[in-house]
Every structure is written in structure tokens, then in C-alpha cells.
């Protein structure tokens, strides 16, 4: 079966503590709240897209443990093809986050994620590959494969290195402002060789380059409870839009809406809702998107 999108990335178990303040050295404090849930950047993105009715799959690795079983059952429950997920003899990955106001500290145990490998035969079923939180060698293999096969690829690069010759093969490069400035020395979008570029800005909003055309997308004002997964939700909006033939500008607007929903709840996937609900919220906040145009 042909799939619309295959995600490639980590599969983690997220533990999020909300705090009044961070503990001092050797101090023990009580958390104000605790959230436990499934995570992993590309997995969060794919979860949105599956809820939107796209045919999705995933390449990753989990442990032969309860957490690994939870990941597979969750994906199967929302219609994500799990044929690209390996079950290995390593504990599943875990991420622990402490959130105090606008500040956040994260500790990760990669575990089974380190055993993830690219699967060309499985990936060939996709119209579109989305990569996030991957090692450089897997990024290179996947991007080259997609380029040779005519498969569109989006890459949320994070801090991973990206050779210039590989960069030009990426259809949609996604970064935040800090990552972009560290890599290119300024916010000039012309410095990037990717075919299209989306940079989320520190003050909210995003800078979008579609071919040679550059736009700025305004963010939506929200009371931030927890920013975990907001970037992953943004990526989902961009991917959904471009797969449906939208401009990158409109696609980024949808990404902003999904990020807006995400930051108002604790946990990366707590805000996921069906597409019809997203359409309703878009109308409610006055966001003009193609699926609401008559």
C-alpha cells in the first residue's frame, strides 16, 4: 500500500514535571503536576497527520518492553503503519522534562532509538518522508534515497550537520531561529540551499522561503503551559498543507495554528484533535486557510 507520509525518528516515553521553580543543588521539591505520554519528534508529527486522515507510516526502533508495546499499539490504533518499526533488545527511549514557567530542562535516554536504521524498501512506499532528530548518516542516506526516487522530503534538522551538497536535495528544511543563526551566521534565508525553507522565530511566527519568495507568518498569541511538541505540531501543519497543494505560506499558517493548540496543554500529543475541529478553531481565531475558503 502506498503511504502519503512516512516519519523517521525517535520513539520516546515522555515524563514532564511542571514546577514552581527548579530545585537547588541537592534539594528535593514537589512538582506541581506530572504528565506521562508517548513522544518523539517525528512521531508527534505523524500522529497529527494520521488524525487528519493521511495514510502514514513510521521508521524507528523500540525496546522489547511495555513502552515499546505502547508505541506500536498507539500507532495501530490511529491507523499508522508500523511495518518500519524494529523491536530490539534495548530499553525504549525516555525523555524527562522539567518545566518552570518559560524555562525547561530535558534529560534524554536514547536507548532503542540508537538502533534505528533506514529502510529503503519500506521508505519507497511513501510520497513524502519527514525526518526529525536523526543522526547525520541516516539523514544522508534518507535524503539521497528520496532525491533519487522523486520522493519529497522534509527535514527538521535540529543541531545535526548538513553538508551543502545534501542541503540542496532537501525539499523543505525546517529549523528554529537559533539553529539557523548558528548554522548560517544570520537570519538571511538566501544563505540556505534547500529548495524551500521554514524558520520558526523566537518572538513567535515564522520566516518562510518558497523558492525565491520570502514571507513572514505571524504567530498566534496563547498562554503557554508547556511547549513540548510545539515544533512537531508546526511541522505537521506544513506537511499537511504542501501535500494538499497549498502554498508554503498557507501551510505555515496551519502549522502556527497547531503549535498554538499544543502549547496550551501539557504533553506533545495532548492537543491533537481531528481535522474538522482544527477547521472550526481556524474560523474561530479568524485564520484564513484553504480548507475554509469557499
Swiss-Prot record:
EC number of this enzyme: 2.7.1.212
GO molecular function annotations of the record: ATP binding; kinase activity
GO terms for biological process, alphabetical: phosphate-containing compound metabolic process
Biophysicochemical property: pH dependence: High levels of activity within a broad pH range of 5.0-8.0.
Catalytic activity: alpha-D-ribose 1-phosphate + ADP = alpha-D-ribose 1,5-bisphosphate + AMP + H(+)
Binding site for ADP: 200-205
Keywords tagged on the record: ATP-binding, Calcium, Kinase, Magnesium, Nucleotide-binding, Transferase
Classification via PROSITE patterns: PFKB_KINASES_2 (PS00584)
Catalytic residues of the enzyme: 232 (proton acceptor)
Disruption phenotype: Disruption of the gene abolishes the generation of ribose 1,5-bisphosphate.
Comment on bound cofactor: Can use Mg(2+) and Ca(2+) with equal efficiency in vitro, and to a lesser extent, Co(2+).
Temperature-related activity annotation: Optimum temperature is 85 degrees Celsius.
Cofactor(s) for this UniProt protein: Mg(2+); Ca(2+)
Disulfide bonds: none
Main function: Involved in nucleoside degradation. Catalyzes the ADP-dependent phosphorylation of ribose 1-phosphate (R1P) to ribose 1,5-bisphosphate (R15P). Can also act on deoxyribose 1-phosphate (dR1P), but is most active with R1P. ADP is the most preferred phosphate donor, followed by GDP and UDP.
Family as reported in the entry's similarity comment: Belongs to the carbohydrate kinase PfkB family.
Name of the protein this chain belongs to: ADP-dependent ribose-1-phosphate kinase
